[in-house]
Amino acid sequence: MGADLLIKNAKIVTEQGVISGSLAVKNGKIAAVASGDLLTEALEVRDIGGKYLFPGAIDTHPHFFDPGAEWREDFWHGTCAAASGGFTTVLDMPNTLPPVKDGKTFALKLRRAMAGSLVDYALWGSAMPDNITDLEELQRLGCIAFKGFTLDAGPDFQWSDEYEQLREMKKISELNGIFGVHAEHAVLVQRFTELYADEEWSLQVHDKSRPPEAELTAVNTL
């Protein structure tokens, strides 16, 4: 066959289970998997000493905050971390500054991803009350899915009440698209946040301000 890369002595993780054997790569794709040794020549041969060999993982929910808040994390540092953990594809969320809400903001973020990403990537788009007419363009440009919020997500990312959620769902359904929702009931979160406002902030207090009932109510409404 002749391969570009032959990986030997591997524990190969497959849908059917773990195979102790070898894997050949040709033109950037898996060409063959076999138990034991593959009898093929290769430009490069690696014996990985019985280590596990996984397919590249996909992170569907990173927040790289690039552009707008790169001090938190940008595409370069975020995808370096992804690659070190075995993630070869990232699907980045649209909560950037500005959010990905139309063709202009999509193009801006795409340039940042092209310049900084170490791994394969795709981009989510936003679904907000003021950009429903832009969803079709976003999909055409390459947005893989749309993200909406059922509660306040900051001044730059509009959240949607039940009426707006219905409008967004109908439009995305017409596009045969995918709609992902940050589902927490706005009133419950607001009231519980007010209830614990006088307590010193901690992870435990933050958790109490967003009880399971807030998520369950939002999901049931959706």
Per-range role (PLM):
Residues M1-L6, K11-P55:
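Histidine-rich, glycine-flanked metal-binding segment
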Residues T60-E73, T96, D120-N131, F157, ...:
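Active-site mouth loops of central-metabolism enzymes
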Residues A10, L23, G28, G50, ...:
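Divalent metal-coordination and catalytic microenvironments
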Residues G56-P62, V90-D92, Y121-G125, F146-G148, ...:
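Hydrophobic faces of well-ordered beta-strands that scaffold small-molecule active sites
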Residues K51-G116:
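Metal-associated gating/positioning segment near the N- to mid-region
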Residues G103-V119, L166-V181:
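Alpha-helix-loop-beta-strand connector modules within alpha/beta enzyme cores
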Residues T133-L222:
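Histidine/acidic residue-rich metal-binding segments in metalloenzymes
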